[in-house]
């Protein structure tokens, strides 16, 4: 056969390093057992371990279970790390550091880490920055990368040494498939002939850590089943049937007894189930849930869903949809823009509050948009989200949005510090660099996962219903579009439709007098872009993105 694999497994050495008692063990892949090699110094830390085992020409990946741990371990490692670089590498790292400083914030830990060839790789980083970090690692300019599970999720970055600091992925255990995927980063034939995997038991690791590492290494991957079969437990599937029998789409019996992700998965399954039942579609979900209901109960559920108006979306349930229809029918619309074309903060707060009521966020988004003050029962996070949302839709740059978020925390320190929707500190201390970095991380995470996902979905449903009731295919002042593109500016929106990321599109628009020729129109745009000037402009993202867009849409450019 002429077929060949780009990557092939090579020699992997696996070690267990217990920083509590200093024990170092090697794993024998054939006997499926650990062999004690000796004891390390009592002063051994993760930082000194990484430095001790890796040569100057080797690259390291350190896996951490949480965003907080990832950032803190990267900062700790940087304190005693002084690598040597070529002049070309120094220039590349300094340029990347400067761009992160300008695009995000001067006090962001990543700004100084990058200069030392260290980075952290987390999902909320802007796509352009994340891509450049990945490229710098592939080019051996970045030597050590601290990461969360984003590395498991499709990012192809091989390394020489992998340090696993926890058996968890967030609050859940790392499953065997994900673990094998993770250690597969080490030992690829086009990168190195062998690699080392170090499973590290940190001083603060729980007592299960060593046993869990052993289980992940020794035992084979169990037979896999579809997520719709395995994600929900039996009692949760029974709760879905019970809820639907009583038209209880809120799943009241489980609302406060499940995690946010489990509750959301229950809702999705329930909504798919009733849509498939309505359409007589014997899907896998229907087959699964029918196991927990009698034929008579299925008939009752079918009778119930005949009484409710069907929704085409599985993002909102029938009770939410009814509230939405009534809200739009009452004359609701998106608030008007300000005279300068930007979005008003108070209008955003008011509109989000209205949506929170009709969409029942306190029930369906209890950890984020619907987080409720225990004393007042108000949606206490709405002002925080509105502070970010109105600037995002108005086209503010990330650095400006982050600066505003930091100011918000300084004004309302009692709102505390949050990481991944969990409160980690009760008060914000403006003099604490860690607190500022947590706010930066929370802001970027809010944009990525709340604004661009949750809010965008709810705005899309509102816009769809508004167009339906008003007989429009499109309409001006569509906030769903403003959220999707992060601006109200028509030129910036067009540039993003053609392939530029938001920051590059904003840069081009802000320099339109030099970079855009409005005297020439085409079938696809009321302007053309000046290719040569774009390729030589100071903005790195614009220079990187332009060649690919030119290949795909050459008629958008002139050579000038």
Task: Pin down the residues of each PLM region.
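Short glycine-/polar-rich loops that comprise or flank the Walker A/P-loop
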Residues: 58, 115-116, 158-161, 192-197
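Long, hydrophobic alpha-helical segments
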Residues: 206-264
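SF2 helicase motor core recognition
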Residues: 130-135, 145-160, 182-193
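Conserved interdomain linker/interface between the two RecA-like ATPase lobes of SF2 helicase motors
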Residues: 1-77, 119
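Short mixed-charge
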Residues: 84-112
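C-terminal accessory/interaction regions of large nucleic acid-associated machines
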Residues: 241-273, 277, 281, 290-293, ...
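Conserved helicase ATPase core of P-loop NTP-dependent helicases/translocases
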Residues: 102-147
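Conserved segment of the helicase C-terminal RecA-like domain
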Residues: 157, 168-218
């Amino acid at each position: 056969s002429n077929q060949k694999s780009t990557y092939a497994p090579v020699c992997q050495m696996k070690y267990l390093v217990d920083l509590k008692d200093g024990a170092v063990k090697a794993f024998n892949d054939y006997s499926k057992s650990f062999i004690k090699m000796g004891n390390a110094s009592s002063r051994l830390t993760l930082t000194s371990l990484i430095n001790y085992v890796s040569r100057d020409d080797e690259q390291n990946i350190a896996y951490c279970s949480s965003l907080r741990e990832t950032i803190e371990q990267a900062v700790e490692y940087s304190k005693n790390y002084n690598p040597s670089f070529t002049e070309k590498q120094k220039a590349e790292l300094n340029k990347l550091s400067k761009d992160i400083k300008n695009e995000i914030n001067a006090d962001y830990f990543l700004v100084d880490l990058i200069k030392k060839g260290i980075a952290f790789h987390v999902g909320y980083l802007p796509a352009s920055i994340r891509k450049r970090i990945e490229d710098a690692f592939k080019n051996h300019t970045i030597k050590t990368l601290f990461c969360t599970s984003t590395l498991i999720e499709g990012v192809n970055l091989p390394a020489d040494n992998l340090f696993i600091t926890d058996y968890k992925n967030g609050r859940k255990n790392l499953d065997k498939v994900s673990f094998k995927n993770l250690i597969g980063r080490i030992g690829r034939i086009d990168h190195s002939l062998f690699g080392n995997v170090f499973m590290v038991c940190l001083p603060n690791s729980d007592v299960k850590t060593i046993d869990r590492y052993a289980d992940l290494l020794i035992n084979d991957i169990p037979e896999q089943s579809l997520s719709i079969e395995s994600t929900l437990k039996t009692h949760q599937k029974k709760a879905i049937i019970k809820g639907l029998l009583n038209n209880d789409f809120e799943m009241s019996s489980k609302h406060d007894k499940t995690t946010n992700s489990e509750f959301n998965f229950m809702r999705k399954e329930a909504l798919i189930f009733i849509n498939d039942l309505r359409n007589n579609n014997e899907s896998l979900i229907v087959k699964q849930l029918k196991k927990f209901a009698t034929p008579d109960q299925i008939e009752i559920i079918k009778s119930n869903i005949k009484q409710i108006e069907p929704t085409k979306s599985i993002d909102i349930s029938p009770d939410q949809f009814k509230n939405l229809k009534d809200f739009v029918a009452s004359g609701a619309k998106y608030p008007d823009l300000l005279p300068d074309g930007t979005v008003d903060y108070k209008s955003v707060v008011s509109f989000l509050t209205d949506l929170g009521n009709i969409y029942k966020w306190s029930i369906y988004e209890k950890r984020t948009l619907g987080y409720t003050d225990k004393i007042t029962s108000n949606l206490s996070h709405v002002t925080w989200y509105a502070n970010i949302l109105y600037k995002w839709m108005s086209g503010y740059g990330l650095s400006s949005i982050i600066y505003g978020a930091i100011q918000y925390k300084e004004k309302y320190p009692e709102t505390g510090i949050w990481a991944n929707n969990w409160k980690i500190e009760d008060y914000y201390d403006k003099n604490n660099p860690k607190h500022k970095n947590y706010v930066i991380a929370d802001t970027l995470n809010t944009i990525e996962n709340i604004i661009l996902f949750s809010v965008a979905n709810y705005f899309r449903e509102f816009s769809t219903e508004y167009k339906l009731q008003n007989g429009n295919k499109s309409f001006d002042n569509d906030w769903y579009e403003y959220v999707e593109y992060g601006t109200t500016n028509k030129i910036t929106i067009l540039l993003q439709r053609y392939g530029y990321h938001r920051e590059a599109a904003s840069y081009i628009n802000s320099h339109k007098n030099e970079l855009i020729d409005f005297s020439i129109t085409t079938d696809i745009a009321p302007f053309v872009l000046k290719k040569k000037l774009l390729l030589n402009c100071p903005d790195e993202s614009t220079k990187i993105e332009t060649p690919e867009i030119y290949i795909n849409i050459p008629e958008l450019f002139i050579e000038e």
